[in-house]
Amino acid sequence: TTVTENVTSLAGVPSWFLVLLKHILKETGKNDIHEIWPNLELFIHGGINFTPYREQYRSICSKGLNFMETYNASEGFFAIQTDPMDSGLQLMLDYGVFYEFVPLSEMGTPFPKSYSIAEVDMHTDYAMVITTNGGLWRYMIGDTVRFTSLNPHKVIITGRTKHYINAFGEELMEHNADAAIAS
C-alpha cells in the first residue's frame, strides 16, 4: 500500500487531501505524516484558497512542507507558483490561452473595458477573460485576480466575480475574508 512507499510529494485540492491525510493518520495510529513518509517535502495544491488550511497542514507535518500553488480550472491551466517565498502565480502565456482583464469596477456596466496583459497594473482587481485554442471565445471564468508583478506577470487570486460584499462601497473581497478567518 501507499503508506509503505517512499512518498516525497503530494498534489491535490487542499480540502480533500486533508481528509485523506487525517484518515491515513487515523488508520496508522500516527500523529504526524512524517512518521509515515519521512521524506515528504512538497505539497502542490490548487482549486481552492489554501490559506484556511495552511495551519492544519502544518499541525500534522512536523518537519514542514513546501507548499506550491497552481491555478487551473476546467477551462485551462493558467499559472504556477515559481517561488515558495512568493505567493504570486506566474501566468503561463504560452499554453494556448489569450488573456483579457476587466477591472472589477467595470463589472455590470453596459460596455466593460477589457485590458490586455500589456495594459494591466498591480493595484486593480480584475475579472479574467480567456480565449483558448480549445474553442472558448472571450469566456469569463468567474475568478478575480490582482497582479503582484508585471515582469514576469504574476497574479494572486482575489476571489470570484460574484463573491464579494459591497453593501456600502467597501468591496470586501473573498481573499480578505478568508485571511481574517484564518488569523
Give residue ranges: language-model regions:
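Active-site glycine/GP-rich loop and adjacent strand/helix microenvironment
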Residues: 1-183
